[in-house]
């Protein structure tokens, strides 16, 4: 053994070829944490000291290659400021450079995921061989940063500026065919041939049949473009990238382009310094803090879900009650992920609608070449429409998705319970109605749970799993595991009106109503909140949700939280409802809707909308300060999120933030309500609440925040 470290081993194979093997002990994946980087340095020294080594094959002892840097170390590193970040990166560059500069050929044998720092290590090698099962990429942009271990410098010299920008800005892992086509890897082979193929390349390099030194030299020099070609390449890249990423919201793509341009005419070492300086600028932005926090929160949520696996019982057969758009969407989602599902309704027209929805979604998958026609047929065969309960004795879980009316749901749930086995779990897809209340209609409330999908089911990643007063842990666990199997992210919440997401969303709509009442133009509110980062403003959102749905939901919330959610005035949303303007459902709401050339509903300004709400505007019509609109909208939403933590509706800030991002489109680069409060400053946020407390209870700072401010505490760190 030439080197035996905690993360890397080096041992001789044959013919002067040694295996340089990454296998981080005590971890399921390889990653570049501090320990690995130190061991990397030691392993390089061991190779340098051994004169018998003529070439290296770089391998992994894990099912993945190297997943990247250790993201949990970023917070501490990035908090030190730009200079400290550059001071941290430059020694890492020296280690990577010393590996690249070894006077012998190196071939990376990429067996699985090689992402971020993992692929940057592959780029240091002279050749890259990729398994057919592997993927490679530089996805750091998703974290609000960009490649910092030399990836931007080496990839742009290897595959050209335009391709490199696309790889890094899109942040999508590349499959073998795409990586080979672009020139990022040199060969793709079957998994069982990987080591042999990599070893053969090393042999060819050692023998002189491959000019590995010339290939390496390309990465050490400036980009091979003259100044005019460079200018054209970067202008094109900037146009493409900045059209998709607003620098005010996502600064990393522009900083990446700036550093690439600064380093393009420089040799490797100077270009790496430009990369490090640009990386540091990105790393200290609040967006990077939020997006890295989001990644870590996602891991927290996944870990919480995984803990339910042991307590779940298998779901071999599911059923859904209600075959409308929602029922059809649920059936599609279950069937497409391999779970057979019965779809029941009371009439053939409803069943036809549900099957049509599933068929349409599957057809789109085939058209996008994400599914073969034969797979579509197999998936449709897993959905069995029926008008009776005859087959329900074989069902493990029933998902009720009938109309959002407590009396209707209670009747349907009680009837269902009589037609299933004693251990069958019944889940309600209610969006606002208390699970504990609905459970009173059942003989076995321990088997009853909430399973709230968001619309459209096939696109929205979140499922709220709601624990009622008597819901068993087995029911929770089974529902969580089914949601995961359906390709969703489940978050377990305790019962209350609106649960977590809708309980938080309705104060946001309430804040909108109050702003309009006070004289704000709803179009200004929409524009301000869109620029703030929301996918759409609140007026447009309630049109999309359905104004009737919003009004009915608001009634449930007002009953549950009368002190904060029962206004003493009629608002613009209710005025629209009374005027039978339901939003996109009937093409008139706050906006008017007409089909565009692609057949999608496009909004246009409708003067009638202003006439409808005019009698309910009591404030002076005026142009509001944009920040006042942001503060009033965000305080109501964030305060209710904190109250959900206070009331133990949701267990952690991580889960609360993830739910808001996945459930209602909270701007990801702001990290969620709790992260937003942290970045505002808890004490400063409480002061804002006090400033607007005269507007009502929804604006009063929760006691949790006052305590945190007094003790200088944050949600994160």
Curated annotation (Swiss-Prot):
Keyword annotations of the record: Fatty acid metabolism, Isomerase, Lipid degradation, Lipid metabolism, Lyase, Multifunctional enzyme, NAD, Oxidoreductase
Residues bound to NAD(+): 326, 345, 402-404, 409, 431, 455
Transmembrane stretches, start-end: none
Enoyl-CoA hydratase/isomerase: region residues: 1-190
Positions that bind substrate: 298, 502
Site (Important for catalytic activity): 120, 140
E.C. no: 4.2.1.17, 5.1.2.3, 5.3.3.8, 1.1.1.35
Pathway: Lipid metabolism; fatty acid beta-oxidation
Catalytic reaction(s) noted: a (3S)-3-hydroxyacyl-CoA + NAD(+) = a 3-oxoacyl-CoA + NADH + H(+); a (3S)-3-hydroxyacyl-CoA = a (2E)-enoyl-CoA + H2O; a 4-saturated-(3S)-3-hydroxyacyl-CoA = a (3E)-enoyl-CoA + H2O; (3S)-3-hydroxybutanoyl-CoA = (3R)-3-hydroxybutanoyl-CoA
Top-level division of the source organism's lineage: Bacteria
CDD domains (alphabetical): crotonase-like
GO cellular component, one term: fatty acid beta-oxidation multienzyme complex
Active site residues per record: 452
Region annotation 3-hydroxyacyl-CoA dehydrogenase: where it falls in the sequence: 313-717
GO molecular function term, any single one: NAD+ binding
Subunit structure: Heterotetramer of two alpha chains (FadB) and two beta chains (FadA).
Function statement: Involved in the aerobic and anaerobic degradation of long-chain fatty acids via beta-oxidation cycle. Catalyzes the formation of 3-oxoacyl-CoA from enoyl-CoA via L-3-hydroxyacyl-CoA. It can also use D-3-hydroxyacyl-CoA and cis-3-enoyl-CoA as substrate.
Family indicated by similarity: In the N-terminal section; belongs to the enoyl-CoA hydratase/isomerase family.
Name assigned to this protein: Fatty acid oxidation complex subunit alpha
Protein species of origin: Acinetobacter baumannii (strain ACICU)
């Amino acid at each position: 053994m030439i080197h035996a470290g905690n993360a890397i081993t080096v041992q001789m194979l044959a013919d002067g070829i040694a295996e340089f093997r990454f296998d981080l002990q005590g971890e399921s994946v390889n990653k570049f944490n501090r320990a690995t980087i130190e061991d990397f340095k030691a392993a390089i020294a061991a190779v340098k000291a051994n004169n018998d080594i003529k070439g290296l094959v770089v391998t992994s002892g894990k099912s993945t290659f190297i997943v990247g840097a250790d993201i949990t170390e970023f917070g501490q590193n990035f908090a030190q400021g730009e200079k400290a970040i550059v001071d941290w990166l430059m020694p890492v560059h020296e280690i990577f450079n010393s590996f690249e500069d070894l006077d012998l050929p190196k071939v990376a044998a990429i067996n699985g995921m090689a992402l971020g720092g993992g692929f940057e290590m592959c780029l240091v090698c002279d050749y890259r061989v990729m398994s057919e099962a592997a993927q490679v990429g530089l996805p750091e942009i998703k974290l609000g940063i960009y490649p910092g271990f030399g990836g931007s410098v080496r990839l742009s010299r290897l595959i050209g500026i335009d391709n490199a920008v696309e790889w890094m800005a899109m942040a999508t892992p590349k499959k073998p065919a795409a990586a080979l086509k672009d020139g990022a890897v040199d060969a793709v082979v079957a998994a069982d041939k990987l080591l042999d193929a990599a070893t053969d390349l090393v042999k060819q390099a050692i023998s002189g049949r491959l000019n590995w030194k010339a290939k390496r030299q390309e990465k050490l020099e400036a980009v091979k473009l003259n100044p005019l070609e460079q200018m054209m390449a970067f202008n094109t890249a900037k146009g493409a990238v900045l059209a998709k990423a607003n620098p005010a919201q996502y600064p990393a793509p522009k900083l990446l382009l700036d550093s690439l341009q600064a380093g393009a005419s420089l040799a490797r070492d100077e270009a790496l310094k430009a990369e490090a300086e640009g990386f540091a600028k990105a790393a200290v932005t609040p967006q990077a803090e939020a997006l890295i926090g989001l990644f870590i929160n996602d891991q927290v949520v996944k870990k919480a879900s995984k803990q339910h696996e042991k307590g779940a019982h298998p779901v071999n057969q599911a059923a859904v009650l209600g075959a409308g758009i929602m029922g059809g969407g649920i059936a599609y989602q279950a069937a497409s992920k391999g779970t057979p599902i019965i779809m029941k309704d009371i009439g053939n027209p409803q069943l036809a609608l549900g099957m049509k929805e599933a068929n349409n979604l599957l057809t789109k998958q085939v058209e996008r070449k994400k599914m073969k026609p034969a797979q579509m047929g197999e998936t449709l065969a897993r959905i069995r429409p029926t008008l009776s309960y005859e087959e329900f004795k074989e069902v493990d879980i029933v998902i009720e998705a009938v109309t959002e009316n407590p009396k209707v749901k209670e009747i349907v749930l009680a009837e269902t319970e009589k037609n299933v086995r004693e251990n069958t779990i019944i889940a309600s897809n209610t969006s606002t109605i208390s699970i504990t209340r609905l459970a009173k209609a059942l003989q076995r409330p321990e088997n009853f749970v909430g399973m709230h999908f968001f619309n459209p089911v096939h696109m929205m990643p979140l499922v709220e799993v709601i624990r009622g007063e008597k819901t068993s842990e087995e029911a929770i666990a089974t529902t969580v595991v089914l949601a995961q199997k359906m390709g969703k992210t489940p978050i377990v919440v305790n019962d209350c009106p609106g649960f977590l997401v809708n309980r938080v969303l309705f104060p946001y709509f309430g804040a909108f109503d109050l702003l309009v009442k006070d004289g704000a133009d709803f179009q200004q509110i929409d524009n301000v909140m869109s620029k703030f980062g929301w996918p759409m403003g609140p007026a447009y959102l309630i049109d999309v949700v359905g104004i009737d749905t919003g009004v009915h939901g608001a009634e449930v919330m007002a009953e549950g939280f009368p002190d904060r959610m029962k206004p003493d005035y009629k608002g613009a949303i209710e005025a629209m409802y009374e005027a039978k303007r339901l939003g996109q459902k009937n093409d008139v709401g706050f906006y008017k809707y007409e089909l565009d050339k692609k057949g999608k509903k496009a909004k246009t300004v409708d003067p009638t909308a202003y006439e409808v709400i005019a009698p309910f505007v009591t404030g002076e019509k005026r142009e509001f300060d944009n920040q006042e609109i942001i503060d009033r909208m965000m305080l109501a939403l964030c305060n209710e999120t904190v109250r959900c933590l206070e009331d133990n509706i949701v267990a952690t800030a991580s889960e609360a933030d993830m739910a808001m991002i996945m459930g209602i489109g909270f701007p990801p680069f702001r990290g969620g309500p709790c992260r937003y409060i942290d970045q505002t400053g808890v004490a400063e946020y409480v002061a804002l609440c006090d400033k607007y407390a005269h507007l009502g209870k929804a604006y009063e700072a929760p006691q949790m925040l006052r305590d945190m401010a007094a003790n200088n505490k944050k949600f994160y760190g």
